[in-house]
């Protein structure tokens, strides 16, 4: 990572790899028109990776997200050269947004504050690299394409990087580097927790950037395959038994399955309310759903991506508990994909609940628009 950091410090781009994807990236503070031209010639759309805090501070959330978590903007000029775009990006990340045209050809992407330790994505790794090199936490990157216009795989990317003298790093390299030098969860206390319906657990309390989080642990979890549920906080579903979602039923089923197994972990993720938008915003989304929006479009209408959750903190808690091989209770493929990047061996265990008339549109939207693995009986 030191070689990669040194390269970007000198204002030169590097290559990042993530399984079957690759991208060229550079800290936003040193992007130039020449680099943008190079990206436009060899890559797909240009992305500007910013934290959610930066997006709010710059007022960019007033524009609608497109394609999930992207906001397309440009400088408000008649004709826009690559150098003018580069200058616009540099001024934007320094806090001087100026006049903004929407939509545009620079795609702002929301990244997590704690980088790859919170979400192991290309955008987060690029921002982490910028931080590591001493720049502001923002980066410009673009997915590499083949000469034929297809997505560049690893072999093509490695050859391309060699031809253009670009150092290469992988997301897992950044994760390993940061885990060795940083710790974002702290185990504070452990106590016995007898429950009314699910037997007795060990309640392990952690301090994290998302707040205080509890992991309910049953049996030896530092060996063999371990049943794991990473459950997103849902006051309305878990406590008030709302029919709008299936969250409460999923939590109950998971705890029952762990109790029957006699071994497992349930992590209750604070800060995940409303897929990360918070309780009041979730209620606002409910109101929009009453007016005809689905659960995904309601979040977008409020100025949020469809899903702001990430699972890096849960991954660090599982590491602290010495869990290595996971049978993950989930219907969310994103959760599986993210946790695998932290080195866990994972097999999915479906968690099925019976839909009702009220939550059926919600579940269908999650399946159709977010790719959740939900089966409906005819």
Curated annotation (Swiss-Prot):
Function comment: Catalyzes the conversion of GTP to 2,5-diamino-6-ribosylamino-4(3H)-pyrimidinone 5'-phosphate (DARP), formate and pyrophosphate.
Cofactor binding, per record: Binds 1 zinc ion per subunit.
GO BP annotations, alphabetical order: riboflavin biosynthetic process
Annotated positions binding GTP: 229-233, 250, 273-275, 295, 330, 335
UniProt-recorded name of the protein: GTP cyclohydrolase-2
Residues annotated as binding Zn(2+): 234, 245, 247
Protein's organism: Archaeoglobus fulgidus (strain ATCC 49558 / DSM 4304 / JCM 9628 / NBRC 100126 / VC-16)
Residue ranges, annotated region (GTP cyclohydrolase II): 181-378
PANTHER family listed in its UniProt record: 3,4-DIHYDROXY-2-BUTANONE 4-PHOSPHATE SYNTHASE, GTP CYCLOHYDROLASE II-RELATED
A GO cellular component annotation in the UniProt record: cytosol
Family to which this protein belongs: In the N-terminal section; belongs to the DHBP synthase family.
Ranges for region DHBP synthase-like: 1-180
Keywords: GTP-binding, Hydrolase, Metal-binding, Nucleotide-binding, Riboflavin biosynthesis, Zinc
KW Transcription regulation (keyword) present: no
Molecular-function GO terms, alphabetical: 3,4-dihydroxy-2-butanone-4-phosphate synthase activity; GTP binding; GTP cyclohydrolase II activity; zinc ion binding
InterPro entries with a match to the protein in the record: DHBP_synth_RibB-like_a/b_dom (IPR017945), DHBP_synthase_RibB (IPR000422), GTP_cyclohydro_II (IPR032677), RibA (IPR000926), RibA-like_sf (IPR036144)
């Amino acid at each position: 990572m030191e070689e990669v950091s040194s390269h970007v410090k000198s204002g030169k781009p590097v290559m990042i790899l993530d399984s079957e994807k690759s991208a060229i990236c550079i800290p936003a503070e040193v992007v130039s028109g020449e680099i943008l031209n190079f990206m436009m010639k060899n890559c797909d759309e240009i992305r500007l990776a910013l934290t959610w805090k930066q997006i709010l501070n710059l007022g960019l959330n007033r524009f609608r997200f497109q394609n999930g978590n992207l906001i397309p903007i440009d400088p408000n000029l008649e004709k826009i050269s690559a150098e003018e775009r580069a200058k616009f990006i540099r001024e934007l990340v320094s806090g001087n947004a100026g006049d903004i045209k929407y939509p545009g050809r620079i795609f702002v992407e929301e990244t997590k504050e704690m980088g790859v330790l919170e979400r192991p994505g290309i955008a987060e790794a690029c921002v982490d690299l910028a931080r590591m090199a001493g720049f502001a936490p923002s980066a410009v990157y673009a997915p590499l394409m083949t000469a034929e216009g297809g997505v560049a795989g690893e072999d093509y990317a490695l050859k391309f990087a060699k031809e253009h003298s670009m150092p290469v790093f992988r997301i897992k390299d950044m994760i390993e580097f940061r885990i060795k030098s940083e710790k974002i969860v702290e185990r504070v206390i452990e106590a016995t927790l007898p429950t009314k319906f699910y037997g007795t657990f060990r309640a392990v309390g952690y301090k994290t950037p998302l707040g205080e989080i509890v992991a309910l642990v049953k049996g030896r979890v530092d060996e063999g395959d371990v049943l794991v549920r990473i459950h997103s906080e849902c006051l309305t579903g878990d406590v008030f038994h709302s029919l709008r979602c299936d969250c409460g039923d999923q939590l109950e089923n998971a705890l029952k399955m762990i109790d029957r197994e006699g071994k497992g972990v349930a992590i209750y993720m604070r800060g995940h309310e409303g897929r990360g938008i918070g309780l009041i915003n979730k209620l606002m989304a409910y109101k929009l759903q009453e007016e005809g929006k689905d659960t995904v479009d309601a979040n977008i209408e409020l100025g949020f991506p469809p899903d702001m959750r990430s699972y890096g903190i849960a991954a660090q808690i599982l590491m602290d508990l010495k869990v290595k091989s996971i049978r993950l209770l989930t219907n969310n493929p994103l959760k599986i994909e993210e946790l695998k990047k932290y080195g866990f061996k994972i097999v999915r265990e479906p968690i099925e609940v019976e839909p009702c008339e009220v939550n059926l549109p919600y579940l269908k939207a999650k399946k159709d628009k977010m790719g959740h693995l939900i089966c409906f009986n005819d």
